[in-house]
Every structure is written in C-alpha cells, then in structure tokens.
Amino acid sequence: MSDKPISKSRRDAVKVMLGTAAAIPMINLVGFGTARASAPANAVAADDATAIALKYNQDATKSERVAAARPGLPPEEQHCANCQFMQADAAGATDEWKGCQLFPGKLINVNGWCASWTLKAG
C-alpha cells in the first residue's frame, strides 16, 4: 500500500477526466475486436427501385434464391461472384464490392444475389 494520502484536488479530477476522454477514441478505433464491414457510398441500397424489382440482397443466404432459382447452378451456389453481370473492373471496386451491369455506377456485394443471376460463361 502507498503511504500517500488520497488527494481529492481539482487537479487530480481534471487528470482523470482528461485520461478518460483520451481513452474513448482509442476504444472506438479498436472496436472491441469486432469486424465491421461497411458498404461503400455508392453501394446499391436496399430501397433502390431496381434492387427491389430484382429482389437484390447483399447477403445471398438471406435472399429468395430457392423460390426464384435460375438454371446453371443449385440455388445455394448462386451469388454475384459467379454471375455474368458482375464487373470486376468497375470504379471503386474492392475484393468484396464489384460493379454490375444491372446497376450502372453502383457497387454490389460479391456475396449478394438477385433474380437476374446468370451463370458466368467459361
């Protein structure tokens, strides 16, 4: 134990407050170890008219693939990454987000699905 008496001075209180305030941004940067995938600004939104018409979902496992399956692959294997309409060289494309001929100027998730899915040739 310390022989130093507990000091409740204003200076000590300010030090504690500043230390706490400095730690908050660091906690947000660390994110408590959780991965957060964020969609790019030009990603197809869920309320996009074309997305609604084509039943597009960024997560193919949550889409209506079984009911609206297209020929070429079993429904559980159909996703944007193996679709003919996906454009890997679109502006702003990443490993997870690519362009699509059906959504000009916007990006789709490679793990997504829509009712126009068509097996990529070759």
Swiss-Prot record:
Which cellular components does GO assign to this protein?
A: periplasmic space
Which GO biological process annotations does it have? aerobic electron transport chain
State where it is primarily located: periplasm
Q: Which residues bind [4Fe-4S] cluster?
A: 80, 83, 100, 114
Q: A single GO molecular function, which one?
A: electron transfer activity
- Key words of the record: 4Fe-4S, Electron transport, Iron, Iron-sulfur, Metal-binding, Periplasm, Signal, Transport
What does this protein's UniProt record list under function? Specific class of high-redox-potential 4Fe-4S ferredoxins. Functions in anaerobic electron transport in most purple and in some other photosynthetic bacteria and in at least one genus (Paracoccus) of halophilic, denitrifying bacteria.
Quaternary context: Homodimer.
Q: What is the lineage of its organism?
A: Bacteria, Pseudomonadati, Pseudomonadota, Gammaproteobacteria, Chromatiales
Protein's name in the database: High-potential iron-sulfur protein
Q: In which domain of life is the source organism classified?
A: Bacteria
One Pfam assignment: HIPIP
Similarity section: Belongs to the high-potential iron-sulfur protein (HiPIP) family.
Gene3D superfamilies the record matches? High potential iron-sulphur protein (4.10.490.10)
Q: Where in the sequence is the signal peptide annotated?
A: 1-37
Q: Does the keyword Zinc apply?
A: no
- Cellular compartment(s): Periplasm
